[in-house]
A protein has these predicted regions:
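Active-site helix of classical SDR
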Residues: 113, 150-153
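Substrate-binding pocket helix/loop in short-chain dehydrogenase/reductase
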Residues: 89-90, 97-100
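SDR active-site lid
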Residues: 167-237
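Conserved NAD(P)H cofactor-binding loop of Rossmann-fold oxidoreductase domains
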Residues: 81-86
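Conserved glycine-rich cofactor-binding loop
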Residues: 11-13
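Residue(s) in the substrate-gating loop at a strand-loop-helix junction
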Residues: 134
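A short, exposed helix-loop element centered on a Lys and neighboring polar residues
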Residues: 113-114, 159
Length: 263
């Protein structure tokens, strides 16, 4: 049965792959992008591939955009995928960058979800919301701690929504990617250079040496996008979905180790 599915952050990465895959499966997909040039690229690529796709503008930090989108579209599934990463040592990271990241990763995603939840409840119909969080929701990665904090927050909100909305037959799930080569992680690391200066900041530049190795071993994003698609369409999916399995096992071990970690 065809579903009406709206995806945020669909201009690239997991959101774009998932949007195209869902459209190929025959679902009515609304792929949203933050700015108009991204929309043009999506429209052109969908046309080139012969894919029927509705493309619209949605900046999740823009209340006018959110009001317009929630008013215009009746959907069955929301895939809340838009997000940004600001990197750097949290003890020195500029607070304005952390706030702007939380605006996108937490408050924007929640405000959009609230708009569609109200429609689901008012119209007395079921719905599903899938939040793309991160493996960083479940543990804290050094030098992207503030980003992980935003994903911790969104994961807690998602878990609260899951319980609170169960009486209304609204399903909630999270998808928690490991390290995939969408360009997202690379851009997040690049943000450090906008403010970090080894001459004035006390964190040594050598602290970031492990980052290059991690970025050199990123996974193919196709499998993660397929995971998001499967979770969105599965009416009985798990709430939390860490992918790949090796990342899930790694995170579980880190969580177990946290109970005996010293200060």
């Amino acid at each position: 049965m065809s579903k009406r599915i709206l995806i945020t952050g669909a201009a690239s990465g997991f959101g774009k792959i998932a949007a195209f895959d869902l459209a190929k499966k025959g679902h009515k997909v609304i792929a949203t992008a933050q700015v108009y040039p991204q929309m043009s690229d999506l429209i052109r690529e969908a046309k080139e591939q012969g894919i029927e796709l509705t493309v619209d503008k949605l900046d999740v930090t823009n209340a006018t955009d959110i009001a317009y989108i929630t008013r215009k579209y009746d959907i069955d599934i929301l895939i809340s995928n838009a997000g940004i990463m600001e990197g750097g040592p949290v003890a020195e990271q500029p607070l304005d960058l952390i706030r702007s990241m939380f605006d996108v990763n937490v408050f924007g995603g929640l405000q959009l979800a609230q708009g569609f939840i109200k429609k689901f409840v008012d119209e007395k119909r079921p719905g599903k919301i899938v939040f793309t969080t991160s493996m960083g929701e479940l543990w804290t990665v050094p030098y992207v701690a503030a980003y992980c904090a935003s994903k911790h927050a969104m994961g807690s909100i998602a878990e609260g929504l899951k319980t609170e909305l169960a009486p209304f037959n609204i399903k909630i799930a999270t998808c928690n990617p490991g390290i995939f080569g969408t360009g997202f992680n690379d851009r997040g690391v690049d943000t450090i250079s906008r403010w970090y200066d080894p001459e004035t900041n006390f964190t040594p530049s050598s602290a970031f040496d492990d980052t290059a190795e991690a970025l050199a071993n990123q996974l193919d994003p196709q499998s993660m996008a397929e995971c998001i698609v499967d979770v969105a369409l599965d009416e009985n999916s798990n709430f939390r979905n860490v992918h790949p399995k090796e990342t899930e096992d790694f995170v579980k071990q880190l969580q177990a180790d946290a109970w005996t970690a010293k200060s």
